[in-house]
C-alpha cells in the first residue's frame, strides 16, 4: 500500500520506518525543510535504538521517502497517518492546533479515496472533529474514512515494541476501513483489537494513566519503606510475583517524565473535568510524581545542610535511558532547584546533552565522561539509569571524590555493593549506607 505519515517526530518517524520495513511504500511529510533534508541523508532527528539503521535501509530500497510538500506527499496515498504533536496547554488540555491544520491540509490535497488514521494521542471526540474538518474543506469528490490507531511504544525500545507489541488497537465503526487496516498491519503478526473510535481514543489515555499510577504508587510505598526500615526492592519483587499485579512499572525512583505520562495524565484530568467528573485519583498520581522529583534534592539538603557553593554532579539527564528525550525529565526540576540554591552543577549524559542545553539552567557545566563530572565534586546525584552509569564501579568514586557521597535516584547499586565500596550512599526506599566515621 501507499502510506503517508504526517509528522516526523517520535511517533511519526517510527511509524513510517516500521511500515516501510514490512513492505509498504511510505512518504513522511514534515514542514521542517532542514529536518527533511537530514533524513534524506540518513540522519535521524531522534535517538532511538535501531531506528536510523532501518531508516537508511528502507530509504536505499526505495520504500521510504521524505517530503515537505503536502501536494506531492498526499497525491498517491491509500492511507494517511496523522502523527503530529498534541502538546500540553498551560491549563492541562491538549493543544490540537497541529491536528486541525493536518486535517485541513489533507482535505485540500487528497486526490483519491483514503483512510485517515489518527496516530497522535488525542482527547476523546477528536476524530469526530477531524472527520468534520476534512468533510467541510474537501477539495475533491473523494471518500474519506477516519479511524483511530493509538500507539503504545516505549521510548528506548520503540522499534522492538512495534514488531513485538501486545496489541494493535483500531477504532472504527466501518467494516471496510477495519479490513483495510487489518491488512496493513497483518505482517506485524500482533493481535488486533477493533473497537469504536471513542473507546480507542480512551484506551490510550487510560493505559498511560494506569501505568503512571503504578509508578506513583510504588514511589509512595518506597517513601514509607524508608521510614519503617523495609527495602523497596524486596517489596516490589514480592508484589510483582502476584500475576494480578505484575512486575512491570514497580521500579521506585524519582518519578516519571517524557512526552507521554505527564501530558496524558494532565489531559485525562481535563477530559474528566469537561464532563464534570473530578478525577481525584489521577490528580494524586500527578502530585506524588511532582513531589518525588524533588525528593533527591531534599535528601542532599538534609545531609549537607545546604548546597550553596557545593559542586553537585548529575549523572544522566534524559527522562529514561536509551533516549535523548528531555521532555519533563526529572533532571530539569532537580537542576533548576540546585541552581536556585546557588550550587555548582556538573552534568553527564551519553546522548542527551545537546537537548539538555536547551532546557537546563545556563550555569550547568557539561562533561564528556562520568569521571570528569564526578572528580572533585561534593556529591553525586544519579538521575538516569543508563548502562554506563549503572556499570560505573562504586570503588571509582573513592578515587574521584574526597568524601564519596552518592544520592541514587534510580537504585542502580545494591546496598551490599555500596557497603563494600565504603561510600556514603542514599537511594530510594532503602536504608542509607553510612561508613563508620562519615560526617552526617
From Swiss-Prot:
* Catalyzed reactions: UDP-alpha-D-glucose + 2 NAD(+) + H2O = UDP-alpha-D-glucuronate + 2 NADH + 3 H(+)
Location(s) in or outside the cell: Cytoplasm
Supply the InterPro entries for this chain: 6-PGluconate_DH-like_C_sf (IPR008927), NAD(P)-bd_dom_sf (IPR036291), UDP-Glc/GDP-Man (IPR017476), UDP-Glc/GDP-Man_DH_C (IPR014027), UDP-Glc/GDP-Man_DH_C_sf (IPR036220), UDP-Glc/GDP-Man_DH_dimer (IPR014026), UDP-Glc/GDP-Man_DH_N (IPR001732), UDPglc_DH_bac (IPR028357)
What GO annotations for molecular function exist for this entry? NAD binding; UDP-glucose 6-dehydrogenase activity
Presence of keyword Oxidoreductase: yes
Chain residues that bind substrate: 151-155, 204, 208, 249-253, 257, 320
> Keyword Ubl conjugation on this protein?
no
Q: Which residues form the active site?
A: 260
Modified after translation how?
Answer: Phosphorylated on tyrosine residue(s). Phosphorylated by YwqD and dephosphorylated by YwqE in vitro.
Q: Where do the annotations place NAD(+) binding? A: 2-19, 30, 35, 121, 155, 263, 327
> What is an annotated GO biological process for this record, any one?
UDP-glucuronate biosynthetic process
Keywords from the UniProt entry: Cell wall biogenesis/degradation, Cytoplasm, NAD, Oxidoreductase, Phosphoprotein
Tell me one Pfam family matched here. UDPG_MGDP_dh_N
- Regulation of catalytic or functional activity: Competitively inhibited by UDP-glucose. Activated by phosphorylation, which may increase affinity for NAD(+); inhibited by dephosphorylation.
Q: What class of enzyme is it?
A: oxidoreductase
Metabolic or biological pathway, per its Swiss-Prot or TrEMBL entry: Nucleotide-sugar biosynthesis; UDP-alpha-D-glucuronate biosynthesis; UDP-alpha-D-glucuronate from UDP-alpha-D-glucose: step 1/1
Spell out the GO cellular component terms annotated for this protein, sorted alphabetically and separated by semicolons. Answer: cytoplasm
Q: What is its EC number?
A: 1.1.1.22
Family statement: Belongs to the UDP-glucose/GDP-mannose dehydrogenase family.
Function according to Swiss-Prot or TrEMBL: Catalyzes the conversion of UDP-glucose into UDP-glucuronate, one of the precursors of teichuronic acid.
What is the name of this protein?
UDP-glucose 6-dehydrogenase YwqF
Organism encoding this protein? Bacillus subtilis (strain 168)
Amino acid at each position: 500500500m501507499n502510506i503517508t505519515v504526517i509528522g516526523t517526530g517520535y511517533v511519526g518517524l517510527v511509524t513510517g520506518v516500521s511500515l516501510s520495513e514490512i513492505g509498504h511504500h511510505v512518504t513522511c511529510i514534515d514542514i521542517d525543510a532542514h529536518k527533511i533534508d537530514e533524513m534524506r541523508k540518513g540522519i535521524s532527528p531522534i535517538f532511538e535504538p535501531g531506528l536510523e539503521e532501518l531508516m537508511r535501509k528502507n530509504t536505499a530500497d526505495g520504500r521510504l521517502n521524505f517530503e515537505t510538500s503536502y501536494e506531492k506527499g498526499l497525491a498517491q496515498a491509500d492511507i494517511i497517518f496523522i502523527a503530529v504533536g498534541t502538546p500540553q496547554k498551560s491549563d492541562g488540555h491538549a493543544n490540537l492546533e497541529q491536528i486541525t491544520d493536518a486535517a485541513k491540509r489533507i482535505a485540500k490535497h487528497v486526490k483519491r479515496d483514503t483512510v485517515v488514521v489518527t496516530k497522535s494521542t488525542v482527547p476523546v471526540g477528536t476524530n469526530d472533529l477531524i472527520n468534520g474538518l476534512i468533510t467541510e474543506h474537501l477539495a475533491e469528490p473523494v471518500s474519506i474514512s477516519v479511524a483511530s490507531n493509538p500507539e503504545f511504544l516505549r521510548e528506548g525500545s520503540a522499534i522492538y515494541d512495534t514488531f513485538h507489541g501486545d496489541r494493535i488497537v483500531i477504532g472504527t465503526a466501518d467494516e471496510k476501513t477495519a479490513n483495510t487496516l487489518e491488512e496493513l498491519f497483518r505482517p506485524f503478526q500482533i493481535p488486533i483489537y477493533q473497537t469504536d473510535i471513542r473507546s480507542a481514543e480512551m484506551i490510550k489515555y487510560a493505559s498511560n494513566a494506569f501505568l503512571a499510577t503504578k509508578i506513583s504508587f510504588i514511589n509512595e510505598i518506597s517513601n514509607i519503606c524508608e521510614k519503617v526500615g523495609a527495602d523497596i526492592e524486596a517489596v516490589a519483587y514480592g508484589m510483582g510475583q502476584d500475576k494480578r499485579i505484575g512486575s512491570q512499572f514497580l521500579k521506585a525512583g524519582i518519578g516519571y517524565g517524557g512526552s507521554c505520562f505527564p501530558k496524558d495524565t494532565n489531559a485525562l484530568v481535563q477530559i474528566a473535568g469537561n464532563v464534570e467528573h473530578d478525577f481525584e485519583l489521577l490528580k494524586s498520581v500527578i502530585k506524588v510524581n511532582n513531589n518525588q522529583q524533588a525528593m533527591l534534592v531534599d535528601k542532599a539538603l538534609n545531609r549537607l545542610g545546604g548546597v550553596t557553593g557545593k559542586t553537585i554532579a548529575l549523572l544522566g539527564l534524559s527522562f529514561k535511558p536509551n533516549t535523548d528525550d528531555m521532555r519533563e525529565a526529572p533532571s530539569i526540576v532537580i537542576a533548576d532547584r540546585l541552581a536556585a540554591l546557588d550550587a555548582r552543577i556538573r552534568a553527564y549524559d551519553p546522548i542527551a546533552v545537546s537537548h539538555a542545553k536547551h532546557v537546563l539552567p545556563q550555569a550547568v557545566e557539561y562533561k564528556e565522561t562520568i569521571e570528569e563530572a564526578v572528580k572533585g565534586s561534593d556529591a553525586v546525584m544519579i538521575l538516569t539509569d543508563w548502562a554506563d552509569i549503572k556499570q560505573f564501579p562504586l570503588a571509582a568514586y573513592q578515587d574521584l571524590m574526597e568524601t564519596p557521597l552518592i544520592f541514587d535516584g534510580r537504585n542502580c547499586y545494591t546496598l551490599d555493593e555500596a557497603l563494600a565500596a565504603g561510600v556514603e550512599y542514599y537511594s530510594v526506599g532503602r536504608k542509607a549506607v553510612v561508613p563508620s566515621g562519615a560526617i552526617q
